[in-house]
Design a protein with these regions (language model features):
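Loop/turn elements at helix/coil->beta-strand transitions in domains of secreted/extracellular proteins
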Residues: 23-26, 72-75, 101-106
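Acidic catalytic loop of the alpha/beta-hydrolase fold
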Residues: 36, 82-86
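Active-site nucleophile elbow and catalytic-triad environment of alpha/beta-hydrolase enzymes
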Residues: 52-67, 72-73
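Short beta-strand/loop motif that positions the catalytic acidic residue
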Residues: 71, 76-79, 83
């Protein structure tokens, strides 16, 4: 389970595991950073992980939507469509890759909430 940059870590564990013993059984991602593609990544997360001068090979290796296989564990992804910190395309493209590879996945998109709502009592949908 991971939120924001922690979502990148959780999706890394789910797509880069070395053998079946280290493969997670499932992944829960909240408004995750998934890609390192410059056009829609979270720049701060990208720079912190890869540095400012990352190669194209590094960018692709750490763009987890490109690393999904039929063996990737099932996923539950939650985000808000108005997230201005981590573009929703991170989650949408990851979900699409999971489905294209036959991996069971569920995605819920709240219409409002922005980023980081899991830690805010003011989140509209929090009970």
């Amino acid at each position: 389970m991971g939120a924001s940059a922690g979502g990148h870590l959780a999706s890394m564990l789910s797509t880069h595991y070395s053998d079946s013993a280290s493969r997670p059984d499932f992944q829960v991602l909240l408004y995750p950073v998934v890609t390192m593609d410059r056009s829609y990544t979270h720049k701060g997360s990208r720079d912190n992980l890869l540095g400012k001068n990352a190669s194209e090979e590094q960018e692709k290796r750490f763009s987890n939507e490109l690393q999904v296989t039929p063996s990737t564990p099932q996923a539950f992804i939650v985000l808000s469509s108005d997230d201005r910190t981590v573009p929703p395309a991170n989650s949408v493209n990851y979900y699409s890759s999971l489905i294209a590879n036959g991996v069971p996945a569920t995605m819920h998109i709240y219409p409002v909430g922005g980023h980081g709502w899991g830690f805010r009592d003011s989140f509209k949908y929090k009970r």
